[in-house]
């Protein structure tokens, strides 16, 4: 299995269990799923006496449910929700992308990436940035578990069918780790 880590923060953000497609040479896209996840669950050890553990005989309190993306849940990504005021405004996100592009380029150079890889990133990134900014209002924005503001922001939108969510990540902003 291959885990993809953000080269800036080191956060795990993707794995090869997703069907990953390269877009425009610089972006990865992968289809996701949305599902209801139970919240506030009380976990008990199998065979434990619930009353001795401070629980009740019915197996604990019932939790609520929240809709999550599988990639968000699997990699403990943090959703910057617009309704909570956490999603950055478009201008702020544009500034983040500018800084992020410089950091990715430096990281590629520091790790001795081949010239072809660096040139592919330099050539493809500006068009990808424009494409992302044009569609920014449609994206859900997520960050890695560390909440490193300089790291990659994972973008989630829906395919043309309006049902299938997909994540967009920067190909050159990831490093592979075999596990």
Swiss-Prot record:
GO terms for biological process: cellular response to osmotic stress; negative regulation of asexual sporulation resulting in formation of a cellular spore; positive regulation of cleistothecium development; sporocarp development involved in sexual reproduction; translation. Induction: Up-regulated when grown with elevated levels of potassium chloride. Gene3D superfamilies: Metal Binding Protein, Guanine Nucleotide Exchange Factor, Chain A. It is found in: Cytoplasm, Cytoskeleton. The keyword Protein biosynthesis applies. Its main location: cytoplasm. One of its GO terms (cellular component) is nucleus. One of its GO terms (molecular function) is calcium ion binding. InterPro entries: Mss4-like_sf, Mss4/transl-control_tumour, TCTP, Translation_control_tumour_CS, Translational_control_tumour_p. Residues 1-179 form the TCTP domain. Keywords: Cytoplasm, Cytoskeleton, Microtubule, Protein biosynthesis, Stress response. The keyword DNA repair does not apply. Belongs to the TCTP family. Involved in protein synthesis. Involved in microtubule stabilization. Involved in osmoadaptation. This is Translationally-controlled tumor protein homolog. It comes from Emericella nidulans (strain FGSC A4 / ATCC 38163 / CBS 112.46 / NRRL 194 / M139).
